[in-house]
């Protein structure tokens, strides 16, 4: 964490400069401190094609003289040097006591926008600026910036289909399992096949108590994958995809396979 001067603060201070000064009865020159920060509650952002989502960035900060009402700015730094910020949506800080405030800024993400490409998928780092009520009287000590406050995981949505046949099947005979993995293409606005990905064929006997991994599969052309495996008991079969730094993890719907004795 470090204190920053007005000259490096960014768009936030340009707006604050036009606002009337907040009263600072106790001229304590201690810079503000960022206590915690989160983006989307720490959850992974999973986005499909042509999807619009508004998410919240939260920063909790304190200063001896309090945090000014509009004293927060949040940016995300991501893959390929990309920067994500939302200057058009309001950011505010609400006090919870005389020194501490909860600051929020809203980010509107539209994967149908030409500004969003598939390269935006990945891990982003959260940066924040906070300003105390000393901003107008002692700007040199009223601002703090901090980077790497949180990791924001942005993933392209994934889908898995799955089919198993024959069903019912004689005990000991092979079941043919076929699936397809598709992922959101934010640039074309559709789901497309994802070749070269790893998926797990899993099984749980009836009644389901323990999931059994059966086989590791790899997707080929158009995201298709398949295998055969002997059926020994009634139960449900499905595919599980663990995801990557670009694609979200997902499961296929389960298929119950009835196994006939003899």
Please provide the spans of the model-predicted regions.
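Secretory targeting and sorting signals
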Residues: 1-25
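Beta-strand-rich domain onsets/edges
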Residues: 31-49, 146-191, 256-261
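Extracellular acidic, Ser/Thr/Pro-rich low-complexity tracts
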Residues: 51-69, 75-81, 132, 183
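Short flexible loop/turn segments that cap and initiate beta-strands
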Residues: 66-79, 185-213
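Glycine-centered loop-to-beta-strand initiation motif
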Residues: 99-105, 210-229, 235
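Signal that preferentially marks extracellular ectodomain short beta-strand elements
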Residues: 102-121, 227
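Enriched for extracellular/lumenal, surface-exposed ectodomains of secreted and cell-surface proteins
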Residues: 118-140, 233-253
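Short Trp-Ser/Thr-centered turn/loop motifs at beta-strand boundaries
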Residues: 142-155, 219, 226-229, 246-257, ...
